[in-house]
Amino acid sequence: FQPNGNYMSYIKFEKNQVVNLEYSLGKEIIRTNRGGSYSSTTIVDCNTRKYHGLLVCPVDEFGGERFVLLSSLDVTVVNNDRSFNTGIRKYNGDYFSPKGHKYIEDFNADNIPSRIYRVGGVILKQERLLVHYEEQFLLRFTILEASEPMKLQVRPFLAFRNIHQL
């Protein structure tokens, strides 16, 4: 706890760390709901393992095996008739597309994992949370600054696959 009343962040990465994929792809975060489900990815939100996913749950109808239900989100900020995809995916070899990690200004995972993006004339905060003992993934966006009207497009990338299969 700092004298000004703010909490000190212990799990925090700044832009120069996040944009360096050699560094940031090795930094992973996992959160559980205390009921068997979890959310796991890298700090730049690039799934590099078959066990990664935003909502991974045991499915009773399949013997309680864990399934990746929500793999990732494609989030696009539309500002001044320009589209900025904040996502990143890794393909065979070291090919990445889109390269939305370059818009991340800050990553913090102390209480609720959050990323702050600077995209065009917009500063956007994204927070993610799993509900305790429920198979629910919560997502909140906060517009911290927007010099002009903007739109936010969110597309879920659903998988529904066993965590051991690709």
Predicted regions and their residues:
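Terminal accessory carbohydrate-recognition/targeting modules of carbohydrate-active enzymes
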Residues: F1-L166
